[in-house]
From Swiss-Prot:
It comes from the Eukaryota. Keywords: Chloroplast, Membrane, Photosynthesis, Photosystem I, Plastid, Thylakoid, Transmembrane, Transmembrane helix. Disulfide bonds: none annotated. This is Photosystem I reaction center subunit IX. The gene is psaJ.
Length: 42
């Protein structure tokens, strides 16, 4: 039961950090390549 409580307290923190980093990455990509339907990396 203690492991379940530890998991339930760690998972929201990790998911918040992950989604925050993902949102920041998407914002930076949209800043450098605005309105890109395909990425001009090729």
């Amino acid at each position: 039961m203690r492991d379940l409580k530890t998991y339930l307290s760690v998972a929201p923190v990790l998911s918040t950090l992950w989604f925050g980093a993902l949102a920041g990455l998407l914002i930076e990509i949209n800043r450098f390549f605005p309105d890109a339907l395909t990425f001009p990396f090729f």
